[in-house]
């Protein structure tokens, strides 16, 4: 990951391989934003972009405007979702209006449009950005343990392929997520995940501070761990 300061206080992490063009591949505007660079205060400090929170809507609007501007888009072209830890991926169609007026229930957005950005929000969960740069299809997925176990990543790939992508051409970048040492879960998580994937038992460790709980390596690996920053951070392509 490479960090670019879009403004003096607005860092954006991005994958260098997508940020440059080549004779074979076009560059792709994308990024994983942090909790820094916004105007929210208190528990939402500072780049909170979640309309589902109790933050001041005017602050959320300004934070989202900054993210959109950092990617080169107007705020009404930054489309997000009402995420609910599902395996539902949806297509952003050509007929979609302003992003401010809609937040459909889903955990992944896919689009073939070149005039918009699709975004998901994470705190502890894993953001995954997808791109088929050969065929002009992109996706953004929110993968918590329920969504990942339920197939949100597979749903995103399937939706992309249904709209012109090919498996051989799809690339994915995994963004920052909670580290195992900070991710305490209960029996419900362990039982559900291990029932579906028996080999995943190795990724659960009894929490030494709470023996009735476990520490879990979300999605089995968390290559870019974060510690303790819980505002709703946007990831976009």
What does each model-identified segment do?
Residues 1-222:
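Active-site microenvironment for binding and transforming phosphate-containing groups
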């Amino acid at each position: 990951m490479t960090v670019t300061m879009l403004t003096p206080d607005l860092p954006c992490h991005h994958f260098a391989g997508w940020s440059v063009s080549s004779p074979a591949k076009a560059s792709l505007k994308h990024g994983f934003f942090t909790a820094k660079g916004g105007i929210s205060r208190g528990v939402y400090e500072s780049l909170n972009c979640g309309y589902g929170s109790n933050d001041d809507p005017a602050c959320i609007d300004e934070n989202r405007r900054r993210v959109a501007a950092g990617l080169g888009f107007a705020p009404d072209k930054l489309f997000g979702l009402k995420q609910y830890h599902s395996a539902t991926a949806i297509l952003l169609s050509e007929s979609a209006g302003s992003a401010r007026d809609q937040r459909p229930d889903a955990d992944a957005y896919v689009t073939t449009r070149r005039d918009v950005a699709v975004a998901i929000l994470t705190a502890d969960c894993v953001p995954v950005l997808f791109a088929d740069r050969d065929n002009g299809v992109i996706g953004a997925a929110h993968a918590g343990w329920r969504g990942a176990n339920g197939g949100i990543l597979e749903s995103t790939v399937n939706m992309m392929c249904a709209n012109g992508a090919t498996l051989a051409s799809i690339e994915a970048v995994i963004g920052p997520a909670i580290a195992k040492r900070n991710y305490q879960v209960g029996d419900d998580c362990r039982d559900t995940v291990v029932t579906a994937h028996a080999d995943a038992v190795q990724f659960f460790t009894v929490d030494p501070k709470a023996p009735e709980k476990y520490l879990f390596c979300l999605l089995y690996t968390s290559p870019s761990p974060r510690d303790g920053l819980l505002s709703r951070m946007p990831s976009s392509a």
